[in-house]
């Protein structure tokens, strides 16, 4: 029997979603809790990888178990007691055997925050960067991302990606009333460390190291 889980997590204490040898991951932590609760070996498949330290406000994963779970809501209740405080499960839903958390996901969205001042309360959730940035130039460069689909320039070296092709639907910077910048990017898939690499290069545009046209040449 297959089930979808909807969850959220604070990734500060984890190497990312995917299981890694000798490193804490969200996937491994969730599998251990489910295995304990359901009393059988459980392997969980996620909608995609998230990098070290990345938070997820809405994430979907699936797992298979031998017997149907009579009360999924009760499992969610108990699961949240077993899991550490930085991982929360919102729901558990029975699905068909061919439903797949990764292959069924049509798009994924990242939000990356840059705070222009030191703030001890957001240091784990924002990049605190104190150099003034030109958001108009950064948005001009970000808009160019929709024109390309090969992001080899922003792929992690020596990764095992079968392809570096990604289709980006949206990429833009906004600022709130406190001056905190937010980069929102939505695509069908992301490469490992791709978002961080993009943000770093766009920040270089914002501080004048590259022009928007120079950014295009990098892409």
Predicted regions and their residues:
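Structured-RNA-binding interfaces characteristic of tRNA pseudouridine synthases
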Residues: 1-219
């Amino acid at each position: 029997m297959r089930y979808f889980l909807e969850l959220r997590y604070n990734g500060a204490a984890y190497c990312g979603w995917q299981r890694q040898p000798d490193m804490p991951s969200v996937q491994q932590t969730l599998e251990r809790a489910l295995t304990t609760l359901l009393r059988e070996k459980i392997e969980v498949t996620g909608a995609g990888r998230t990098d070290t330290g990345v938070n997820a406000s809405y994430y979907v994963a699936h797992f298979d178990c031998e017997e149907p779970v009579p009360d999924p809501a009760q499992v969610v209740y108990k699961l949240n007691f077993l899991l550490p405080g930085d991982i929360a499960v919102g729901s558990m839903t029975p699905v068909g055997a061919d439903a797949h958390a990764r292959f069924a996901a049509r798009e994924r969205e990242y939000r990356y925050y840059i705070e222009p001042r030191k703030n001890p309360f957001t240091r784990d959730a924002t990049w605190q960067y104190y150099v003034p940035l030109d958001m108009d130039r950064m948005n001009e460069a970000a808009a160019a991302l929709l024109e390309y689909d090969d992001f080899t320039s922003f792929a992690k070296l020596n990764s095992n990606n079968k392809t570096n092709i990604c289709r980006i639907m949206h990429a833009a910077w906004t600022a709130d009333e406190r001056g905190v910048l937010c980069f929102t990017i939505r695509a069908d898939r992301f490469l490992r460390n791709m978002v961080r690499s993009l943000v770093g290069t766009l920040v270089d545009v914002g501080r004048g190291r590259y022009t928007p046209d120079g950014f295009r040449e990098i892409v």
